[in-house]
Amino acid sequence: MLNLVLMMIERVGLIVILGFLLSHIKTFRRLLHKQDGYVDKLKLICIFSVFTIVSNYTGIEIAGNTIMNENWLQGVSSSSTIANTRIMGVGISGLLGGPIVGIGVGSIAGIHRYMLGGTTALSCAISSILAGVITGYIGYIFKKYNRTITPKFSAILSVFIVSLEMIMILLIVEDGMSIVKTIAIPMILVNSFGSFILLSMIQAILRQEENAKALQTHKVLRIADKTLPYFRQGLTEESCKHVAQIIHRFPGTDAVSLTDTEKILAHVGLASDHHIPSHSLITGLSKEVLHTGQIMKAKSREVINCQHEGCPLQAAIVIPLTSHGNTIGTLKLYFKNPNQLSRVEEELAEGLAKIFSTQLELGEAELQSKLLQDAEIKALQAQINPHFLFNAINTVSALCRTDVEKARKLLLQLSVYFRCNLQGARQLLIPLEQELNHVQAYLSLEQARFPNKYEVKMYIEDELKTTLVPPFVLQLLVENALRHAFPKKQPVCEVEVHVFEKEGMVHFEVKDNGQGIEEERLEQLGKMVVSSKKGTGTALYNINERLIGLFGKETMLHIESELNEGTEITFVIPKKVGEEEQIVKSISS
C-alpha cells in the first residue's frame, strides 16, 4: 500500500506541474476569472480534460495485490484495475468552471477511462460523470452566493467523491471488495492531497495577479490624482515638469520625460544633463512613436537611439499622448537596467498614458468651455453696453427726422446684431453666412454713426458660405480693426475681408490701411492679454485660443503689421460643411 501511495504522489506531482504551467498562461487565468459564453466553457473543458486524460494514462495498473504496470498505459487487461488521480482534474474543473464544465470534463474522463478497459472501467466511467455533476453544481452554488471555495473544502470533497467511486466498484464489479481494499485508501489520500495542492497553487497565482493589479491600479490612481491639476493647464513645460517629478517619486523608473511633437517639455532623473527641456527631440524612438502613434519599447541604447555619447539610459518605453485621436506628445519611462522594464512597468505606462490623454482632453474641453463663456459674456456685455446702445439709439433717433426708411432698416440691423450675439454665444460653430450677417449688422450701425468714414470691402467665395466657423471670429476682427487701427484724423479708413478656399483649407484675411502695430506689442498679440492704453488684446487672444483648441496649432492667428502702412491678420481652418453636431461632440467628449 505504501509503495502505491508513493507512486501515486509522483503522478500528483506531474498534474501539479501541468497546472502550474497553465496558471502562468494569461488566457487560462482569464477563463478561471470569467467565462463569457459557451466558447470559453468549451476551452475550459478541453484544458481540464487534458488533466484527466494524462491521469488515466499515468495510472498504475493493479491485479489483485500486485502492481502490474507503472509506466504509460496503452490499455488495461480485463482482470486488472487502475489506481489514478483522475478525480482531481474532474473535481477542480467542476468547482472552478460550474456544471457545464464539470459535466463535460467528467464525461470525457469517464469515456476515456472506459476505453482503456479493465474490471473497473464501467464503474470508474460512471463515477467520473457523477463527480463532474456534483462538483459542478457545488461550484455553481458557491459562485451564486459569492462564497470562496477553499483548498480544505476541495480536499474533503475529493474524499467524498473517491468514496463514491469505491461504492460504485462494490455495486458493479464482481469481487469488488478485494479491489477496494487495495486501492481505496491510497486513492482517497492522494486525490484529496492533490486537490488541496492544485487548488492552493492556482488560487495563489490568481491572488498574486490580483494583488499586483490592485497595487498597480492604486499607483496609477495616485499619480492621476496628483497630476490632474497640472494637466488641466495643458501640455506646457511648467505642467509637464510637475507631472514628471510626481511620476519619478514613485519607485520603478530611473528617469521620466514628457514631450510635445517637437521638443522635450520635461525630463527628471538620469541623463538630465543632455535631455534638456525646450531642446529638440534627441531620441529616434520618440520620433517614431510620434510618427506611428504606437507604443514602442527599447531594451538597449542602440534602439533608444539617443544622440548623446555615454547616455546611461539602457531601456525605455515610449507611449503616445493623444487628444481627440491625434498624437500630441509622448510619455517616456527610462531605465538604466533593461531587466527593470517588466510587463508590470509596461502596463503602468500604458495606464498612465490613457489617463493623461483623458486629462488633456478634459483640460482642453474645460478651456473651450471657458473661452465660450468669455465670448458669451462679451456678447451679453455688448447687448447691455450703455454707450453702444445709446449711440445706436441716438443714431436711429436722428435718422427718424431725416430718413424714416433708413431708420427702420437700421433698427432691423440692430435686432440682427443682438440676435447674432445671442445665437453665437450658445454655439461652438456656425455657418459662415451667419457670421457675415453679424459683421454686416455691426458695420451698418457703425457706418450710420460715422458716414463715409469706413470703407469695408468683402470678398467671399459663395460656395464657402455654408462652411462652419467659430462665432464672433470675423466680427471681432473687423470690430478690432475699426476701433484700434485708425487714428482719429485718418481721412480714408479701409478694411478688406477675404475668404477663399485653397488645398482643402478655408483661408481668412482681414486687412486695414491703419497706423500699424509696434513690433514689441505685435509679438505679444494673440498669445497673451496685454495691458496698454490702446486695449488689452483680449479679443485677439480669445480668437487665437479658440482656433487652436478647435482645430490645432496650424490654425492660429498670423499677424503682420508695418507702422503707418497697416495690419493684416490671417488664419486657416479645415473646410467643414454641415458637421457642427459631430464636431461639437468630439470637442466636448
Swiss-Prot record:
Topology of the protein relative to the lipid bilayer: Multi-pass membrane protein
Entry keyword set: ATP-binding, Cell membrane, Kinase, Membrane, Nucleotide-binding, Phosphoprotein, Transferase, Transmembrane, Transmembrane helix, Two-component regulatory system
Pfam annotation, one family: His_kinase
Principal localisation: membrane
Domain of life: Bacteria
EC number: 2.7.13.3
An annotated GO BP: cell wall organization
Domain Histidine kinase: 360-577
Chain segments annotated as transmembrane: 4-25, 45-67, 87-109, 116-138, 153-172, 184-206
GO cellular component, as recorded: plasma membrane
Modified residues (Phosphohistidine): H387
Entry GO MF terms: ATP binding; phosphorelay sensor kinase activity
EC top class named in words: transferase
Keyword Phosphoprotein: yes
Domain GAF: 235-360
SUPFAM superfamilies: ATPase domain of HSP90 chaperone/DNA topoisomerase II/histidine kinase, GAF domain-like
Localization (cell): Cell membrane
Catalytic activity: ATP + protein L-histidine = ADP + protein N-phospho-L-histidine
Function: Member of the two-component regulatory system LytS/LytT that probably regulates genes involved in cell wall metabolism.
Protein name: Sensor protein LytS
Protein encoded by which gene: lytS
